[in-house]
Amino acid sequence: MKNSQDIRSGFKAQRYSAPALNIARCTLNVTRVLFIILVCLSATTLVYGQEEEGGEIESVEIEIVKVKQITMPKANRNFEKVPPRPADPLAPSMTYDFKSIDFAAPDYKPVVKPLRLKDETLSKIYGNYVSAGFGNYNSPFLRGSITSKRNAEKFYGVDFLHHSYGKGPVDGEYSGMGYSKLNGYLQGMGPKVTADLGLTYENMFNHYYGYPAPKPESADDIRQSYNILGLNAGFTNTKTSDFNFKVSGDFSYLDDRFEASESEAGLHFNSRYEVNKTQAFILKSDYILVARKDTKVEAKPRHLFRVNPAYEFTILDRFRLSAGLNAVVENDSVGKDKAAHIYPDAWIHTELAKTVDAYAGITGDYEKVSLHTLARENQWLNSNVGIFHTNKSFEFRGGVQGKVARKFSFHVGASVINYKHLYFFVNDPLDRSRFDVVYDNAVRLNLFGELGVVHGDKVNISLRGDSYNYSMDKLDHPWQRPSYKVGFYSSYKIVDKVLLTVNMISQGGAKAYDNEADKVVTLKSAMSLDAKVRYFISKPLSVYVEGNNLLNNKYPIYQFYQARGLQISAGVSWSF
């Protein structure tokens, strides 16, 4: 009990100040902690004792004595608040007066001045040019063109060309030749129709130098000259539309140095009507009138009328087809069984790849043959030769063409044509320097391949090869016609001011009949290698050096007509 009283007296309620109370609480907390530690130690001892003595609890008396008392002084508290700062009155006092203000601004009339740009200087157009040169074989060269510039409503101009050889491969002036052409043209463009008009004059002269020895007394005795005067006119729609057309007409008159003359007139119509993107109707038509006169040939009109309708359409978005016919009416007398001829005209095109197309088709036609045609192909014609149109009664043609890697293009194919009265050249038995014309039926197989390479403006190459095989009806051979042709054409821009062109032409396998030896001969293969280097002194002015037949081959053009050997020429060109 004494202990209990001591404990109670130690915790007698007293009034302490705040610091004293905090210290008392801290002391009490320490005392409690010590008490708990002692209890735990006692319990451990008791447990241990129980384990050793069999679990009996010994009676223990604990006495806690608190004798220390902490006394803290009383704290002084100040409960006085800070008074607010007095506000100073405004002097003078402010008054507010609100008034409505009407603001009327005048109408704004801006003056916009467009930006004045300097007039752009138009680049000079070098549409006119003149080129002149001279070479061995006494060969002057002159070529030029003068045209209008920057006119959206009309275009006109004049072209001229002269190239002659005063001497040739046989007896100098006895084998001279030349060609001249003067061409004037005018074109007017309206909003709906564009019309054009042209006038042309040509002169071709040569010598019959395929004579045997001795040579004639005068070169003028064997000179042949053709003069051709031509006129053409036409009109077409100016803007491309669903219906496009072109109508044209032409007239040409030819005479030679002797007594042959020929008039040729033609009317041509070409139209296309687009139904939609996959269908179209096409109509082509021609009428040609030819009249020739010679010492033994009376002027007789030869008519050739052709009409070719066709329908184009697309199926399966891949195949483009054209189905039509070609109807021809003519009045030639050779091999004539009927005046009217009808041929199928059907074609199919398909896309094998994005840039590769294949095509095939069958057709037929009548090919115009006149003195104009033969004289341009062979200037050593005899007088009074027979002239008839060629009936191409059947033709099949197919091939594949396309581009590879944008720089390479190719075209390979084959054609089979059945000709009726196809013309061939044979030497006159009485005068071997002149050629007669004979006709025969023939089937010709042509295999061809073409390759092109374009690399910007640096390189441009074209190579084509043709193989011909003839199956004749009556003639032993296709006289004077080659069995193969190879052509190589290229241009190279070596540097900015130097342009090189290299061309090569080769043909061979042609056969001819030698009347003097009474045997068939195979003409020597022809190969001509040509090169030209042009140096640009400035943009409008350049000079050139040209070499033809650089291999100096003495190959025959036709039997007894030898080609010129090495030819070198140089000249200057000026654009303005």
List each model region and its residues:
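Surface-exposed extracellular loop regions of Gram-negative outer-membrane beta-barrel proteins
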Residues: S148-G168, A280-K284, K300-D332, G456-R464
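Flexible loop and strand-edge segments within Gram-negative outer membrane beta-barrel domains
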Residues: Y165-K181, D196-K246, D250-E264
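Residues on the lipid-exposed face of transmembrane beta-strands in outer-membrane beta-barrel proteins
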Residues: G144-S148, V158, G184-G188, L231-N237, ...
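Transmembrane beta-strand segments of Gram-negative outer membrane beta-barrel proteins
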Residues: L90-P110, R116-N136, E153-F160, S241-V247, ...
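Outer-membrane beta-barrel transmembrane domain signature of Gram-negative proteins
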Residues: D221-G234, S248-F319
